[in-house]
Amino acid sequence: MPSIVSSLLLVVLLTSPLGAIPVLYPSPPPLPAYPSPGVRILRPPESLVAPLGDEVVLECETSLPPERFEWSYRRWTPNGTAVNGSPGAGFKYLKTSSMKANVTQEAAISRLKVLVRQDTLGEYRCNGWFGPLLVTSTTARLELATTSVKSQEPVTSLQWQITNGNSVLWPCGQPVRSNPAASWTFYRNGVELGPEYSGTGGNLFLRNVSVDSSGSYSCQATNPASGERIKSTSSMELQVVPSRGSQVKAPYLLPGQPGSQTVTAIEGGTLLLLCPGVGSPPPTAVWSSPDIVGAVNNKRTRVLAHALEISNVQIGDSGTYICYLDNGVRPPLEHFIQVKVEQPPQIVRPPWIDMVNEGERVQLECEATGVPTPEIYWLLNGKSSIYDTEAEQLPNGHLVLHSVLKRHAGYVQCFARNSLGEHSAGMSLQVTPKPIHSESTQQSDHNHSKANRGRRPAQMIPPSAPNVTRLSDESVMLRWMVPRNDGLAILFFKVQYRTVGEGKRKNWQTTNENIPYGRPEWNSEMGKSFTASVTDLKPQRTYRFRIMAVYTNNDNKESNMSAKFFLQPGAALDPMPVPEMLEIDEYSETAVVLHWRLDSDADEQLITGYYAYYRPSSSAGEYFKATIEGASSRSFTIGNLEAGTVYEFKLQSFSAESASEFSALKQGRTQRPMVSTTEEATLQTGVRDTTTPSHNETFSMSPIVTGTIGGGAVLILFVVTTCLCMWRRRNSRAHRGGGQNKPRMAELREDFVPLDSCSPTKQRQRSRHIHITLNPLAQQQQQALDEKNDAEHDMTYFQRQPTYDYDPGLRRMSSSSLRRSQRTLERAGSSNGNNNNLNQSADMGPVDNPGKPGRVLMKRPRLSSRSENLSSGSLNSVGV
């Protein structure tokens, strides 16, 4: 069955229309994970071999539709290098729609049609422009299909006679050269043989020959690209005779058969090792290898008659193989076969760097494997590094930029190249420009300049050029920094942007948002960093951004422009790893610490950093933003928060071209304000405070120090209070002593009561203390009554303790107690049941008035401040 399938394939190949044949290099192993900025070559052009006059198509596909495609070309040289020796130099851009080449673009695919001529043979590259980034593919070779016979090879005709049962190996195709590798057809007596007789490289292999195998053998090579056929100059006459038991012969080689061999294989392919030789009786082959352990007895090898087949060839299969042909007759025949396994180049350590500052020295590393050893070269935004005066390639392939300049910003690629092809890896290099220190253009008036003559004028230090990251199809995130400086303070920032590459130059557009500078503190060694988002953009367009800083002198200064940024649609972007928020630690009253992780299968090298968003959980306003540089970060401290406040946080990872989805929201809180240890516990009535302090409360002082300070404060408070009390008592005594020198009857009567009011029957009445609100309109009558009572001084009095008002009693007095007090006052004053006397006088005493009983003199204490203005009129208190 395999022989039938092989025959059908050969027939289809030979009868199909002839054209360009791709060079069948083995597929390289899967690419290792390396930092991809989101734009790359998905399918580079393939090398082709075609005859003159044919039209071939080179096809290139990128991960995203670029702004435009360009193709570059270099003439083919025998060793595949340019004149100056660099494999990455000497390429020139092709003019589109020319007679030699025609370029078409369809979304993310570009096709180059080339007419095969002597001046179009060479190497081609596909270049895709993504804003300021130029991504270059690996090279594709366009070679001419050729078939020829080695001119120095003589015509050979072999005569072989062997016994039946042997196996014969005839190297017919050695004199023929073909590009691409020729397909072989073998003939016996002019009749074509089946493909089951074919070996590798034009070798005819006849197994277990018989008398019927005798005949004249020849071969013919066919170029699969051009269809050209050429007959080999070698022929062989084979005569097979029956074996005789009496004739024995040790294994030997026939004339023209190779002895020692060197075989080259490509990693991943299939290798067939042949062991020629005949004998009588027919010998048996035994395989071994002094260099490779288990070279024969494994799942990838199969022992055939006079051959060893190795599938899925690996680099470890390189070495020496020995074939012993033994038929029992000494000596056995030994074959030494040297196997070399070639490997396409593969970059195992790609270049990677996050961000560099202008003027810094940077070394980019690139390591690759391959056999033969690959040669390393570098492209800086599509241009060979040998043309850059600041670039130097070290012998180990690493690239050194002695002083990074703004022109180095873009796409940096490392290429590894050997005879089997090329492999590349790239990264987006971001350069932070140096801050431009410019003096303020505003000038003071003449007098002010005289007063400040000799002083250095204040400077306006502009922010750095912003770095741009895609957030969505319509928004981006900007990151910039203000370097440490002693210049004018910044009040706020404005973001400006404009589209580029659309014909007429567009004006700058300014966003409405004022981005506050915040606290005048530097949050890093470099200065202070800021972030802001810009929305309402349009995808598939290229933008430039800049930051406008407004200073305290009401002047402004803009930053340098950002690099061109092409806003790509998110549907074509690979998703970024989404961080998972683990926990939020309470760091202090104004700071928390975020902890997160990535999934185990997440590619960390795709990440440039993280964005942290936060806001108070009670707020529905905009999120505050913080930038976390570095893909390996797993925690971050966020400060300048409110004490004892619950915040909600979310994260997203970002790269130069895109950002991930948001992580799940998670809440955390800052520590509560510190509580002093001198604060006394608050006790509720009948309840003892047993509250345990929260773990958020922080005591900044030790208990001994705090207790000492608290005790001292209490002692000082006690001494001050005692002094104030003594001072007030002394003033009170002095006031009373001074008042004795100026006695007044009204004041004396306020402090005395008549003797008849001290009778036992009156004791109960005197014990009451009643507060009555008087009519303010009766104050004039009260004054007249007081003057009358002052004249009646012939009664006997005794002194008693004064009764003072208690202001809260006004709140507790009910209407019922007021009525009882009025009735008591009527009985005491013998007012004939008329309590209207209350509205006439509040201070009473016995008076010598004929026809009237003795009057009761009552004390009217002075009003306290709290009893004033409780109603629309003046309020007085009367004590009975």
UniProtKB/Swiss-Prot annotation:
**Biased composition range(s): Polar residues:** 668-699
Which residue intervals are annotated with compositional bias (Low complexity) in the record? 827-839, 864-880
List each copy of the Fibronectin type-III domain by range: 462-570, 578-673
- Recorded source organism is Drosophila ananassae
Spans within the Cytoplasmic topological domain: 725-880
Which residues carry a glycan?
79, 102, 208, 447, 467, 560, 696
Cite the ranges annotated as topological domain Extracellular: 21-703
Sorted alphabetically, the keyword list is: Disulfide bond, Glycoprotein, Heparin-binding, Immunoglobulin domain, Membrane, Proteoglycan, Repeat, Signal, Transmembrane, Transmembrane helix
Instruction: Provide the disulphide bond pattern.
Output: 60-126, 172-219, 275-323, 366-414
Q: From the record, give the transmembrane residue ranges.
A: 704-724
Q: What does this protein do?
A: Mediates response to the active Hedgehog (Hh) protein signal in embryos, functioning upstream or at the level of patched (ptc).
Q: Which residues form the signal peptide?
A: 1-20
List, alphabetically, the InterPro entries matched: FN3_dom, FN3_sf, Ig-like_dom, Ig-like_dom_sf, Ig-like_fold, Ig_sub, Ig_sub2
Q: How does it sit in the membrane?
A: Single-pass type I membrane protein
What CDD domains does this protein's entry cite? FN3, Ig
**Gene Ontology MF annotations:** coreceptor activity; hedgehog family protein binding; heparin binding; patched binding; protein homodimerization activity
The UniProt record gives the binding positions of heparin as: 498, 504, 506, 544
Query: Which residue intervals make up region (Disordered)?
Result: 435-468, 665-699, 797-880
Oligomer and partners? Homodimer. Heterotetramer; 2 iHog chains bind 2 hh chains when facilitated by heparin, heparin is required to promote high-affinity interactions between hh and iHog.
A GO biological process held by the record: maintenance of protein location in extracellular region
Ranges for the Ig-like C2-type domain?
Answer: 37-142, 154-235, 251-339, 345-432
Q: Where in the cell?
A: Membrane
UniProt lists the gene as iHog
Which family is annotated? Belongs to the immunoglobulin superfamily. IHOG family.
Q: What is known of its domains?
A: The first fibronectin type-III domain mediates a specific interaction with Hh protein, in vitro. The second fibronectin type-III domain is additionally required for in vivo signaling activity.
Listed GO cellular component terms?
axon; cell surface; cytoneme; membrane; plasma membrane
Write out the coiled-coil annotation as residue ranges. Answer: none
The protein's name in its UniProt record: Interference hedgehog
